[in-house]
Amino acid sequence: MDKKLLDKIKIKSLKIIRLPEGDIMHVLKKSELKNWNFNEAYFSKIKFNKIKAWKYHLKMTLNLTVPQGKVKFVFYSAKDSRFKVIKLGEGHYARLTVPPKIWFGFKGISKHESIILNLSNATHDPKEILRCKKNDIKFNW
């Protein structure tokens, strides 16, 4: 089941409209909301070479974009010790949809602070999050 779950992580390329005054970066259209309930949007920041790991959401589906900087996301399947790595941000602007019940962490890989936007189907609830220490899951960041 875990192996199939990692394969359910989806990447959707997003449109950037380049303008001399500053870019317009698409995130989500109303028509894309028909299959899930939007409940909360929030930003997370990550500094260069810093790592935030590991988290496991019991119920929340994540919809992640990186409008500033660049971030390496790492997803882990405990069943077969398999990892999936996806980089988002500068050079690869996309939305990453992550179903619940997947261990994940991320690292800032841009020289300046990166910003992650999460559009989730649930409001923040510390009771639906499992955490473990960075070294509990062995990954060479």
Predicted regions and their residues:
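Non-catalytic, conserved peripheral segments adjacent to functional cores
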Residues: 1-95, 109-141
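Glycine-centered loop/turn positions within well-structured domains
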Residues: 104
